[in-house]
């Protein structure tokens, strides 16, 4: 289960001082990742109606096929290997196991609806024992809505809880909000990159 907070930031906004976050003893070195995600749905938007996103993403430690379901407690993600490469102009074929996972809410054909490229810098926020409290990522996003032919760019931050996060994350997120606001950022108006890419 992914439990995270998203923020918006201007291009020149400096990063928050995450060493001031309760429970964080060390901010790790920056790790750069180039991510390229291609999102699919049915022609009638069955996945969106079920609050589910389907993507094929390259780059980063978790590249592959992802199905993300939005739940009250956070986002539940299921992953599969990438499989054969798909060129920019080639239709993407959804692997059988992925389609089977979605069978209760959507049936083929699936078509590409958005492409999101993301230049990401990630930082591990660890406690005094070296356990991961949270991961902070600084994302510079270029997104294309393939149905409307619209491209948008923005910068956003995400703070995702790790295994060493407190059982009640509310105080941690409240402290994170304060650090972000002090740095010049703001709580995101959009719940997901895909939603923002599609103008939601």
Residues covered by each model-derived region:
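Phosphate-end processing signature that detects enzymes handling 5′-triphosphorylated RNA
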Residues: 1-200
């Amino acid at each position: 289960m992914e439990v995270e907070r998203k923020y918006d930031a201007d291009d020149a906004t400096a990063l928050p001082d995450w060493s001031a976050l309760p429970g964080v003893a060390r901010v790790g070195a920056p790790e750069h990742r180039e991510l390229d995600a291609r999102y699919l749905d049915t022609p009638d938007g069955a996945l969106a109606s079920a609050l589910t996103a389907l993507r094929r993403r390259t780059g980063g430690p978790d590249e592959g096929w992802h199905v993300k379901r939005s739940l009250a407690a956070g986002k539940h993600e299921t992953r599969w290997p990438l499989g054969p490469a798909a060129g920019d102009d080639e239709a993407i074929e959804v692997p059988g196991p992925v389609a089977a996972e979605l069978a209760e809410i959507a049936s083929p054909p699936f078509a590409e609806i958005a492409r999101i490229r993301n230049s990401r810098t990630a930082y591990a926020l660890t406690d005094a024992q070296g356990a991961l409290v949270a991961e902070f990522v600084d994302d510079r996003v270029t997104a294309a809505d393939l149905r409307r032919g619209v491209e948008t760019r923005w910068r956003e931050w995400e703070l995702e809880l790790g295994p060493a996060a407190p059982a009640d994350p509310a105080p941690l997120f409240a402290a994170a909000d304060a650090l972000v606001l002090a740095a010049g950022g703001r709580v995101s108006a959009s719940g997901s990159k895909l939603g923002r890419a599609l103008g939601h």
